[in-house]
Amino acid sequence: MALKDEVFEHGPDPENPGWNHWNLKDPTLFNGAVMGKLITRAEGGKCRLRMFPERKHENLQGIIHGAITLALIDISLFTTMHVIGTGNAGPSVTLELSTQFIGGGDPKRPLDAVTEIMRETGNLVFVRGEVVQGEDRVAAFSGIIRKFPPRAL
């Protein structure tokens, strides 16, 4: 299977005007099976990726599990590349991810990764961002993506 943008479903989300879906067309893969519904939009020069936490995303303390926050961050790197960058997110890979947890995520509120591209070269995308819930910060991060061209069938 060629990894092209066609593996994503990113059309308008009728339940959230101004937002687009960010889902893999195969719901049995990680994004859909673990993260659930994801929506995204451009906000000026930034990208916002939103998830809707469920009980399965909580840890024993009743807050959003750190692994879920990390997964949202990783997915947001590729959303950023697609929404405000120039690369094909499908065949790309995460090279580096640095995260600082700042606070616990409330599972009753949407969780957003807000990102910006610091630099984009022919092969790399440097992204930084924050995970937020309204005015509350959950994490800060930076990451590097390695772009690859789509594989031929």
How does the language model describe each region?
Residues M1-L153:
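Terminal targeting signals and extreme-terminal segments of soluble enzymes
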